[in-house]
Swiss-Prot record:
It is found in: Cytoplasm. Homodimer. The lineage of its organism: Bacteria, Bacillati, Cyanobacteriota, Cyanophyceae, Synechococcales. It comes from the Bacteria. This is Type III pantothenate kinase. It comes from Synechococcus elongatus (strain ATCC 33912 / PCC 7942 / FACHB-805) (Anacystis nidulans R2).
Amino acid sequence: MSRLVLAIGNSRWHWGIFSRDQAPQFWDAIAPHQPFSRSDLATFLQAQDPAIVADTPIAIASVVPQQLALLPEDWPQRRLQLRDVPLTNCYPQLGLDRAIALYEAGCQAGWPVLMIDCGTAITINAGDAEGQFAGGAILPGVTLQLRSLAQGTAALPSVEISAEGDRWGMDTQSAIASGVIYGIAGALRGFIEDWRSHHPQRPIYFTGGDGELLAKLLTDLPDIRVEPHLLLHGIDRLAQAMMTDPD
């Protein structure tokens, strides 16, 4: 039987289908503005995988709790909370997505581990040798920085970001792109080097929509791993564990 997972983010819903017989499937969708009916949700899911049947339970992690109301109440759901993540030393306001993705990185690579989620905001998340949350940082992501420049400065053009862009921009677009992308990469390098001074030769996970892009700028650092769907893998791992041990 297929297993459905859903990560509800600030602007997009991230879906995954896991099963024993085939590789996982992943896709994103813009956050809906209207509630799903039961039949609409079934149609939406079966367009991705015809094998999905109505009432297939969905394991959910949401950083936007109000969007949970957009799902039909009578569709089976397991809504994860921070207390469901076996990661100790978490402060109460720690984002559920951060905790799950860090836990999954630790499950995949062992502890200690560093996980960097490059989404709307970029979060840097450290786990120590005992599997505890060991602190982190939050900074504006690529899109958020570009949006801030556009809103705060008149007549700036739209900009496309590329890891192959020249550091020394020869026009406004390339100068903005360089400032944003290399500025973020420089900040991340500082955190990584500090963490590695305490935990040499331990892996660094990059995830999120801009994870691969930013990781390309740090390829000189050892053991950088890109896992775009780390959060969805973590949701599935936790949901399976909860089914095995519901207490």
